[in-house]
Amino acid sequence: MGDNDRTAIRRKALRRGLVSEYVAAVFLMLKGYRILALRHRTRLGEIDIVARKGDLAVFVEVKARHGEAAAVDAVSAAAQKRIRAASDLWLARQADQARLSQRYDIVAVTPSRLPRHFPDAF
């Protein structure tokens, strides 16, 4: 496999990830969440979606897989640790941090189905 093939595969995966994150964000908005950030990057890691519902800050990992179980299983302990660290930085910058509770969710995006939201997944 040449460099061009690998680059094309990476580009396709990135595009699929971006589309999946957008689909997940729209899905969460329809459920009453306010989207505050997409692909929020910090020096400690990235959060796919930062959302809020009232005084609840929700940090969402989006996984596109062929099955829901595979999507949930794809969020490793290391990824969870990075997301938690990044969320701590995000929370520290919020003026109303003291009154916010937090939750870590997963949204599984699978072909030909509605996304599935797993609240409090980790």
UniProtKB/Swiss-Prot annotation:
User: Protein name, please?
Assistant: UPF0102 protein RHECIAT_CH0000358
- Domain of life of the source: Bacteria
Instruction: Spell out the molecular function terms from Gene Ontology.
Output: nucleic acid binding
Sequence similarity: Belongs to the UPF0102 family.
Mind telling me which InterPro entries this protein's record contains? Restrct_endonuc-II-like (IPR011335), tRNA_endonuc-like_dom_sf (IPR011856), UPF0102_YraN-like (IPR003509)
- PANTHER family linked: UPF0102 PROTEIN YRAN
Q: Which Pfam families match?
A: UPF0102
NCBIfam families annotated for this entry? PRK12497.1-5
Tell me which Gene3D superfamilies the record gives: 3.40.1350.10
Identify the stretch annotated as signal peptide in this record.
none
